From Swiss-Prot:
Function: The VP7 protein is one of the five proteins (with VP1, VP3, VP4, and VP6) which form the inner capsid of the virus.
Subunit structure: Homotrimer that assemble in a complex of 260 capsomers on an inner scaffold composed of VP3.
Family designation: Belongs to the orbivirus VP7 family.
UniProt main location, coarse: virion
Organism of provenance: Bluetongue virus 10 (isolate USA)
Protein name, UniProt field: Core protein VP7
Amino acid sequence: MDTIAARALTVMRACATLQEARIVLEANVMEILGIAINRYNGLTLRGVTMRPTSLAQRNEMFFMCLDMMLSAAGINVGPISPDYTQHMATIGVLATPEIPFTTEAANEIARVTGETSTWGPARQPYGFFLETEETFQPGRWFMRAAQAVTAVVCGPDMIQVSLNAGARGDVQQIFQGRNDPMMIYLVWRRIENFAMAQGNSQQTQAGVTVSVGGVDMRAGRIIAWDGQAALHVHNPTQQNAMVQIQVVFYISMDKTLNQYPALTAEIFNVYSFRDHTWHGLRTAILNRTTLPNMLPPIFPPNDRDSILTLLLLSTLADVYTVLRPEFAIHGVNPMPGPLTRAIARAAYV
């Protein structure tokens, strides 16, 4: 299946180079399109030409690219247009070994397959405590009953620790059961002035320490903590104290947008509004997948099918921009006139 996807990507990118009718094509583009179009026309009985000039010819070439995108992604889109019918035989065209694929396309598909079939450490973009169900007012003393050290969440990436005079304790537990981190990068600071429960102000005295694995850590410096070593706080002074611990970032096995080069840009290209026809076509295609059909996914996709679909659909979007096809989509009423931000914004409502 990797070679099928690589051929589809190669052919679509070759079609995206046809920005002028009289353009001098590169030799490899002529070879790719010559073989691919010949095989495609023979199996589907379409009349795609290598140098489309009329609207009908541009439509035919775009429909060929659409067929290849759907076949490579394994999508059966169904009846979406009175002008287009998906040709299932296109998979046979892409399976033809005579159609070459570029090194770039093959490498990209190999990266998609390789990265989605395994896991690796990645810097996560969200706060470590993002999904906490409760938070506490920053800089306000809070001590639970029968405790001398109390740690609470006060933000998506922040905890604060209240300590009685002379208290020592381990605050590791507040990090447990969250995000399965491989490494957490922390910075701790003294809260110089804080409010007691009665509202009066109190100062944290110098001498309060935070240690990892028994080694005191300097305040205001990034600490690499594996989440397993003891994370101790100690207040040797004779007054109550508070410290703040910030998670600068953390590393885990969760997939991010860095798993594939330019994945963020590919997603933006897919979900961008070009016109109402493209908007309806993209929606109809993504309705047959697990991806959202109008707005980008909340979390990075982590399976091969989703990332491959985004890559292929982004390339099809480039072909759409170049060929400027005109055809109808069921349920879509194109609006005449120039494209404006207001028109694009209204399409997502």
